[in-house]
Regions:
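Short coil turns and loop connectors of transmembrane beta-barrels in diderm outer membranes
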Residues: 3, 19, 25-31, 66-68, ...
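Bacterial N-terminal signal peptides
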Residues: 8-16
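Residues that define the transmembrane beta-barrel architecture of outer-membrane proteins
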Residues: 29-31, 50-56, 89-95, 111, ...
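Extracellular loop and loop/strand-boundary signature of outer-membrane beta-barrel proteins
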Residues: 43-46, 81-88, 135-141, 172-177
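Predominantly the C-terminal beta-signal and adjacent terminal strand-loop region
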Residues: 77-80, 154-195
Length: 195
């Protein structure tokens, strides 16, 4: 009888406490792999189709104290420039390393807001290295190494204990290329917590 009472009390405690257990989030040293994608230099519309671009990124986050984080990764950006009846692609392959400071979060760490800065370096190619166009015109801007940085604003919300939805906006400023220094990006992403 005594054994049955202990088992019933144990089962009741498990049922009562099961909804109150939460995973620990943003612990120092915790890492996450994130995939991001989005638009570059404006919103997509039919009349701006030839001027816009897109980006994809893969990076690793490492959390520090206070839910801030270090971010290291790579990104691919492609932007188009209209020319007569075609569009010329400008592609950038960049690596980045930066720090994102958590300035707002709720008590359970489900919703977090970050502001961050990153150093960036990479390579830019104009029309995939083809300088001569179909009509005989020549592109004067060639392929080049680019360097600079980015300022980012990011929002994270946990979907599960190991899956995070990201919303981001950033302004990139890169020198060395001949097609413009500033590019605004916005997009979404998913992060998968590894540790």
């Amino acid at each position: 009888m005594k054994r049955t009472v202990f088992i019933l009390i144990g089962m009741a405690l498990c049922l009562v406490l099961a909804g109150k257990v939460q995973a620990q989030r943003c612990l120092p040293g915790m890492k996450g792999l994130r995939l991001t994608a989005g638009m570059t230099d404006g919103f997509h519309s039919a009349n701006r189709r030839n001027e816009l671009g897109y980006h994809f990124g893969l990076s690793m986050d490492s959390y520090t104290k206070g839910c801030s984080k270090w971010v290291f990764g790579a990104e691919y950006l492609q932007k188009y420039h209209p020319y007569k009846d075609m569009r010329l692609p400008v592609s950038q392959f960049t690596a980045e390393g930066g720090y994102y400071y958590n300035f707002l979060s709720d008590a359970n760490k489900v919703f977090l807001c970050y502001v961050g800065g990153s150093a960036m370096a990479g390579y830019e190619t104009v029309n995939w290295g083809e300088s001569l166009l179909y009509d005989g015109a020549r592109i004067t801007d060639g392929d080049a190494f680019v360097y600079g940085g980015a300022v980012s604003l990011e929002i994270e919300t946990y979907l599960t204990n190991r899956t995070v939805l990201l919303l981001h906006a950033r302004e990139r400023c890169l020198w060395g290329g001949g097609t413009g220094n500033f590019h605004f990006q916005f997009g979404v992403g998913l992060k998968f917590i590894l540790d």
